[in-house]
Amino acid sequence: MSNRKYFGTDGIRGRVGDAPITPDFVLKLGWAAGKVLARHGSRKIIIGKDTRISGYMLESALEAGLAAAGLSALFTGPMPTPAVAYLTRTFRAEAGIVISASHNPFYDNGIKFFSIDGTKLPDAVEEAIEAEMEKEISCVDSAELGKASRIVDAAGRYIEFCKATFPNELSLSELKIVVDCANGATYHIAPNVLRELGANVIAIGCEPNGVNINAEVGATDVRALQARVLAEKADLGIAFDGDGDRVIMVDHEGNKVDGDQIMYIIAREGLRQGQLRGGAVGTLMSNMGLELALKQLGIPFARAKVGDRYVLEKMQEKGWRIGAENSGHVILLDKTTTGDGIVAGLQVLAAMARNHMSLHDLCSGMKMFPQILVNVRYTAGSGDPLEHESVKAVTAEVETALGSRGRVLLRKSGTEPLIRVMVEGEDEAQVTEFAHRIADAVKAV
C-alpha cells in the first residue's frame, strides 16, 4: 500500500473540505473510476452512504464524475456498507461505492469501493484509478452520458437478506434487545430485522441528523447501551458503528462483548453444528484469551495484520470461513463477502436461541486477558517514532518483563496519524503501567 497516493487500507478517507475529501477531487475520482470500470463492460455503479451531512455533497460529485465517464449511478440512500456490497452483487453492478468514514466523527468522510462480487476492489484496479486521476477529465459524447436513479426498495432487499441468514426454525420472541445504531446507516435496518424475527426491541442511536453519527453512541462508545440494557433489564444489547460493518454486544449484566468474543461464540457454535470448515482468523490485536479458548476446542487460529482486508486475505489463503477483529469487524464467508455487523449479531442470537443460553454464559468459555490500548498522535512526516532507539529500548524492556504470558504490539493506524500501543498480560495493573510507559516514550520522540 506504500506506493499509493490516495487509497489507504480502507479506501480514501479524511476531513471533509480538506484534500482529498473535497467536491472537485471526488468528482474526478468518480470520473477516473468510471473510466477504469467502464472498460469491463457494465454501465451501472451502486452508490450508498452513511448518515453524515457531507454525504449529499459527495454523492452528487461522484455521480457527476461517473456520468461524464458514461456510467450510471444507482443511489441507495443511507445504507450499511455490507448492504452496498450485497446490492452490488445482486444488481450485477460493475462496482459499489460507499461514502462513509465508518466509526470516525461526522466531520470526516471517505470513499471505498466494492468489486462486482461484493469484495474490496483489487489493488490493481485501485492503482489503475489512481493512474487515471493524473489525466485531464474528458467527457463522453452527450448520447453516452450516464444517468442517475434511486433503488427504492434497497432497505427492504437488505432486511430480507439479513433475515435469511438466521435459521428458519428459530425465533427471537423470548429476547428483549436494546439496539444502538450509532445514529448511522443501520438506523432503519437493524431494529426492523430484529422485530421481524420476533424480538422485543428498544432502539437508541436511531435519530440521525447529519452531525451526530458515532457521537457517544454505537460500537465505539457502548456506555449509553450498557446503561440502557441495565435500566430496561434487557437480555442483551447490540451496537453497530456508523456504517454497520462492526458489531459490539453487551450482556444482561452490562459487560461489553467484543469482536474476539463474538467470533469465539460463532466458531464454537459452528463446531457444535458440524458447520465449521477449518479454523478462525484474528489479527495481531486479537486477545490471547481467544487463541487459548479456540485451542482448547481444537479450532486452528491464525493472526493477520490489522485491517479487515488483511483478515479476508488470510481467510482466503487458508480456505477458512470465519475471521474477525476485536473492534467488531466479523467476516462470515458462508453468509457474506465482507464484514457485516447485523449478520454477525444474528449468528450470536441464533446460538443463544438454539442453546437457551444467555450471552453472558456463551462467553464464559473464554477468559479475556487484560489488554490496554493507548493511542498516541504524532505529526505526519516527522519521521517514524517506531524506529526511534528510545522507543525500541522501552519496548524491549516491557517484552522481557512479560515473558511468554503477554504481548506488546506497536503499529501505525492505517487511517489517522496515530501510533497504537497495545500491551497484553495477566495482571491489569502491570500491563496498564507498561502501556503508558511505552506511550510516554513515543510522545517524547
Curated annotation (Swiss-Prot):
GO terms for molecular function: magnesium ion binding; phosphoglucosamine mutase activity; phosphomannomutase activity. Gene3D superfamilies: Alpha-D-Glucose-1,6-Bisphosphate, subunit A, domain 3, Alpha-D-phosphohexomutase, C-terminal domain. The keyword DNA-binding does not apply. Activated by phosphorylation. Keywords: Isomerase, Magnesium, Metal-binding, Phosphoprotein. The active site is at S102. GO terms for biological process: carbohydrate metabolic process; peptidoglycan biosynthetic process; UDP-N-acetylglucosamine biosynthetic process. It catalyses: alpha-D-glucosamine 1-phosphate = D-glucosamine 6-phosphate. The modification Phosphoserine is found at S102. Its EC number is 5.4.2.10. Mg(2+) binds at S102, D241, D243, D245. It holds the Pfam family PGM_PMM_II. Its cofactor is Mg(2+). GO terms for cellular component: cytosol. Binds 1 Mg(2+) ion per subunit. NCBIfam families: glmM (TIGR01455), PRK10887.1 (NF008139). HAMAP family: GlmM_B. Belongs to the phosphohexose mutase family. Catalyzes the conversion of glucosamine-6-phosphate to glucosamine-1-phosphate. This is Phosphoglucosamine mutase. It comes from Escherichia coli O157:H7. The gene is glmM.
